[in-house]
């Protein structure tokens, strides 16, 4: 029941970053509003690209640039100029078809300043690890944060993966805990097995 989900919540669903430190789409909306486009141009495309064939999808791009253009499998769906008084997000509606969607952000002179791209994907076929550092002292006080994701057989990130992953640490390191950012996940932080949430899981090693 929905009430049971709320009872076991660890945090609010609101905010720009989840409990694992992973940015939500709102994080980039804030960036688009506050980052200087001259020094830190950016664009972020959402949601991920995996739906039913022909399903009508609203694709959104937030950017601090002057204008942004959407491409679906290389075909332009038009360029839109952003008006800061009406927000920094542009949207297009298009039927889903497998492949890639890409947004290109331009400055006032038509120069490309930022891009973002999403590819459609199949089921998880491999696990990928990315650590924030290569070594730690092993004294139990220094921590390494390791992001766990999955990719399909073609190497595309599976952005909605919820596979359960078990983590084992060999050598002097110790697994401190796991977090996937899902505030309603009943699994404990101090465990060696959790599901990915929105395709991501964080392992903390000391």
Residue positions per predicted region:
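Short flexible loop/turn segments that cap and initiate beta-strands
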Residues: 64-66, 70-77, 115-117, 143, ...
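Aromatic sugar-binding surface patches on proteins
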Residues: 83-90, 185-202
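Short, small-residue-biased leader/transition segments that mark boundaries at the very start
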Residues: 1-6
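Aromatic- and carboxylate-lined catalytic core of secreted/periplasmic carbohydrate-active enzymes
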Residues: 11-59, 65
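Surface-exposed, short loops/turns at beta-strand junctions within beta-sandwich domains
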Residues: 93-98, 206
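Short, solvent-exposed loop/linker segments at the N-terminal edge
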Residues: 49-55, 135-144
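Beta-strand-rich structural segments
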Residues: 59-62, 104, 141-158
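Edge beta-strands of extracellular beta-sandwich domains
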Residues: 110-122
């Amino acid at each position: 029941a929905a009430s049971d989900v709320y009872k076991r919540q660890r945090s609010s669903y609101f905010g720009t970053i989840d409990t694992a430190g992973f940015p939500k789409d709102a994080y980039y909306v804030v960036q688009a509003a506050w980052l200087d486009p001259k020094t830190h141009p950016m664009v972020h495309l959402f949601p991920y690209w995996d739906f039913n064939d022909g399903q009508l999808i609203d694709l959104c791009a937030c950017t601090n640039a002057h204008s942004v253009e959407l491409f679906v499998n290389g075909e332009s769906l038009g360029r839109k100029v952003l008006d800061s008084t009406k927000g920094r997000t542009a949207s297009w509606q298009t039927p889903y078809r497998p492949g890639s969607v890409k947004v290109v952000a331009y400055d006032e002179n038509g120069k490309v300043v930022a891009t973002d791209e999403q590819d459609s994907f199949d089921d998880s076929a491999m696990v990928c690890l990315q650590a924030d550092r290569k070594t730690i002292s092993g004294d139990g006080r220094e921590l390494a944060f390791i992001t766990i994701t999955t990719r399909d057989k073609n190497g595309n990130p599976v952005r909605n993966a919820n596979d359960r992953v078990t983590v084992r640490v060999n050598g002097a390191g110790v697994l401190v805990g796991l977090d996937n950012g899902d505030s309603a996940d009943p699994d404990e932080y101090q465990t060696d097995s959790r599901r990915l949430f929105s395709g991501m899981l964080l392992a903390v090693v000391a």
